[in-house]
């Protein structure tokens, strides 16, 4: 067995919570979910795909392989880091979409989304996710580098 057999094609590191998608390719959960937030195609073959499914067999094999190579400490640290990133990403997306769905057809300023958020990491992630979602599910007016940019659900401007 080789390292490449247990590596994600997105992050090029050992799988963390590997998931398989419809075309048969496997990725780290964080990597594929982050990718699918902005593009619904497989990063390798570009086939359309649905929700990733956790691949517990590959996860077990990866953990065994990592343990046999005596690099499990670094692997588990990376796993904890990915889980934290995924939680942060999910929290940011919930804040964005909840706010925009409260008043369908209306827009909101990015500063309103982050105004009551105390956690600087979460604020940063909200701003990052807004930039990632523009063109996919969001439209904007103003400079995306500024907090006073106005965002709305894509194609909702005709409803105002």
Curated annotation (Swiss-Prot):
Keywords for the protein's UniProt record, in alphabetical order: Metal-binding, Zinc, Zinc-finger
Cross-referenced InterPro entries: Znf_C3HC4_RING-type, Znf_RING, Znf_RING/FYVE/PHD, Znf_RING_CS
Residue ranges covered by zinc fingers (RING-type): 8-46
Keyword Membrane listed: no
GO MF term (any one): zinc ion binding
Gene3D superfamilies for this protein: Zinc/RING finger domain, C3HC4 (zinc finger) (3.30.40.10)
Name of protein: Uncharacterized RING finger protein T02C1.1
Species annotation: Caenorhabditis elegans
């Amino acid at each position: 067995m080789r390292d490449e057999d247990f590596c994600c094609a997105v992050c090029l590191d050992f799988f963390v919570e590997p998931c398989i998608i419809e075309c048969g390719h496997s990725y780290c959960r964080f990597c594929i979910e982050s990718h699918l937030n902005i593009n619904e195609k497989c990063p390798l073959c570009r086939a359309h795909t649905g929700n990733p499914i956790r691949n517990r067999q590959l996860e077990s094999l990866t953990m065994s392989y990592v343990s046999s190579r005596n690099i499990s400490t670094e692997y588990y640290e990376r796993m904890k880091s990915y889980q934290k990133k995924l939680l942060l990403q999910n929290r940011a997306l919930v804040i964005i979409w909840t706010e925009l769905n409260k008043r369908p057809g209306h827009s909101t300023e990015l500063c309103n989304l982050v105004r009551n958020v105390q956690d600087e990491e979460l604020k940063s992630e909200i701003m990052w996710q807004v930039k990632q979602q523009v063109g996919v599910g969001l439209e904007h007016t103003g400079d995306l580098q500024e907090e006073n940019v106005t965002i709305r659900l894509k194609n909702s401007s005709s409803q105002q």
